């Protein structure tokens, strides 16, 4: 039996992760559709059913380089009984046949070229006398074939008039290929949400600037922007704002055309009040405590920028807290705006390599590295040594969150833990595919 100690207390004044998420998602809806180039549509959601105007293939065509023949002509053909046929034409890919095939005849044909009338099979070059042939007007067939062998039938892929992509489908590389195959260069999708990113703090300097005493590089803007890209949004970056009302309001005003603003820092109870004052002045912003670690402090509400009402999500300034808060709340908001089904990350069971200690009664998202032991074939979770919310390397090294519930003090080494996977390799994919 797992050696877990139940808590005797609970943070009743806090919102659960699920409660906070529900409150946030209630303020979002699916965005409007937009016609975009198919090469820009990867990962987007199709806004309406797509019906093909053509057949794919548009005609019976050859699946091989070879000779179009009539099956009955070669019923007795083999290596010792070569059947010779008269070659009446050559049909390159991109050309239409000009002649009808009769018994005793063949057409030399390339892959993708239309099958001539009268033919019902194709014999590949390697099963003919192609290589040793000196008479281009004749070809020897060395095998018998089945009806329609090596022929791709008209409309076997896509049939004219059929719905080939349903509304709500997520566009993949294969989808883009299908769209191209029916001649479409553009597609109607739910547009990608534009996410404004704004970090705050006098202590920040930008990457590329000279390091200064008392300053730190602004990593949150770049981490959050990368997550927006990863989740299928479009980041709009503002240079970090100083702890001055005028500067913060100026930077926020430049984000008036976004679908969501994400700020980092300034949302904890002990933080400098400039951020809270500006948010309170310009909107209806709630400061929450969420029953999770990292990322307990969270701000969310609607801010008014020049008459436009824009949702604002304020995440903590510590880099790991910012990432986890955006994963737990921002990703879901982006999915809802994109019209995607809002889904949790996959969870697997893994055996702990060392203890996970939960010392303050919040749901703990411990950064862990999951792998499959080559000898035992067991799934192992190794907690990253330094679990501080300021240690960004813990997110770099991890591929999942080991979840310790709020009412548990410790999950011990050797016990099983639920791991929420946020990235994985082929090895972990196999576990996900085979899990109960």
Model-derived regions, located:
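Short, low-complexity N-terminal leaders and the immediately following helix N-cap/first helix
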Residues: 1-79, 108, 153, 340-367, ...
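Helix-rich terminal scaffold detector
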Residues: 1-4, 10-17, 185-315, 319-325, ...
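Short, glycine/charged-enriched hinge/interface segments at domain edges or termini
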Residues: 2-17, 67-237, 385-386, 421, ...
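Flexible glycine/proline-rich
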Residues: 34-39, 48, 94, 158, ...
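Short, conserved secondary-structure segments in the cores of folded domains
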Residues: 46, 58-59, 87, 97, ...
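Solvent-exposed alpha-helices and their adjacent loops that cap or buttress functional pockets
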Residues: 60-62, 77-80, 98-102, 115-117, ...
């Amino acid at each position: 039996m797992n050696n877990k100690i139940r808590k005797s207390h609970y943070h009743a004044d806090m919102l659960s992760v699920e409660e906070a998420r529900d409150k946030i998602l209630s303020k979002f809806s699916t965005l409007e559709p937009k016609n975009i180039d198919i090469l820009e549509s990867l990962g987007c959601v199709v806004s309406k059913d797509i019906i093909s105007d053509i057949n794919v293939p548009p005609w019976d065509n050859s699946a091989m380089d070879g000779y179009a023949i009539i099956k009955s002509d070669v019923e007795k053909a083999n290596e010792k009984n070569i059947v010779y046929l008269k070659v009446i034409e050559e049909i390159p890919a991109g050309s239409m046949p000009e002649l009808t095939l009769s018994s005793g005849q063949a057409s030399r044909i390339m892959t993708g070229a239309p099958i001539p009338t009268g033919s019902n099979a194709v014999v590949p070059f390697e099963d003919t006398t192609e290589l040793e042939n000196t008479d281009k007007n004749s070809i020897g067939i060395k095998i018998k074939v089945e009806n329609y062998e090596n022929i791709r039938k008209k409309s076997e892929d896509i049939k004219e008039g059929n719905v080939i992509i349903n509304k709500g489908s997520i566009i993949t590389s294969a989808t883009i290929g299908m769209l191209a195959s029916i001649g479409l260069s553009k597609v109607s999708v739910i547009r990608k949400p534009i996410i404004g990113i704004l970090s705050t703090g006098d202590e920040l300097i930008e990457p590329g600037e000279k390091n200064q005493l008392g300053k730190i590089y602004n990593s949150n803007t770049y981490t959050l922007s990368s997550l927006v890209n990863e989740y299928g949004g479009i980041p709009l970056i503002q240079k970090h704002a100083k702890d001055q009302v005028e500067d913060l309001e100026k930077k926020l005003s430049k984000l008036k055309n976004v679908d969501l603003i994400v700020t980092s820092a300034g949302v904890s109870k002990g933080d400098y009040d400039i951020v809270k004052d500006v948010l309170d002045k310009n909107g209806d912003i709630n400061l929450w405590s969420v029953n999770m670690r990292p990322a307990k402090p969270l701000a969310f509400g609607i801010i008014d920028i020049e008459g436009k009402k824009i949702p604002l999500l304020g995440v903590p300034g510590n880099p790991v807290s910012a990432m986890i808060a955006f994963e737990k709340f921002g990703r879901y908001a982006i999915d809802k705006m994109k019209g995607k089904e809002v889904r949790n990350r996959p969870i697997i069971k893994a055996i702990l390599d060392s203890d996970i200690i939960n010392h303050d009664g919040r749901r703990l998202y411990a950064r862990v590295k999951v792998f499959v032991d080559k000898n035992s074939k067991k799934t192992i979770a190794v907690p990253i040594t330094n679990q501080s919310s300021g240690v960004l390397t813990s997110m770099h090294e991890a591929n999942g969150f080991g979840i310790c519930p709020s009412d548990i003090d410790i999950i011990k080494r050797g016990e099983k833990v639920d791991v929420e996977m946020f990235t994985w390799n082929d090895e972990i994919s196999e576990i996900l595919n085979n899990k109960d």
